[in-house]
Amino acid sequence: MAVLTAPQSDLLDREASTLPVGEVAAYLQDKLGQRMTAFLTGLSDAKQIGRYARADGPEPRAAVAQRLRHGYKVVRMISDAYDAETAKAWLFGTNTRLDDEAPIEVLRTAEKPEQSTAVIRAARQLASFQE
């Protein structure tokens, strides 16, 4: 299990904000699947994630792109520290740091930056955990 360090966290922050959104969508589609990624972004059409992931695919609306980028950060942190299955389970489990809400619900419905930041902080704590 790889532990997330501060330099790795900074690198991941830069990567999540600079990668083309199509690559971000492709990563999430690979790790979570289309349905779960669509749920995270609030999209009703799961196939839209596949369209975003194509090299010649459309650009998502700003709010969807932001949710994709936040989801990427969270899934990447946990997948790198543990694995994709742990990331999936963590996204759907209630979290006391998020007022007992599931992280995926908070990301999906976030209207303020601090809501997404709380999820990212909770994921960072899990990924930085040392035994």
Whereabouts are the PLM-identified features?
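Non-transmembrane "mature" sequence context
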Residues: M1-E131
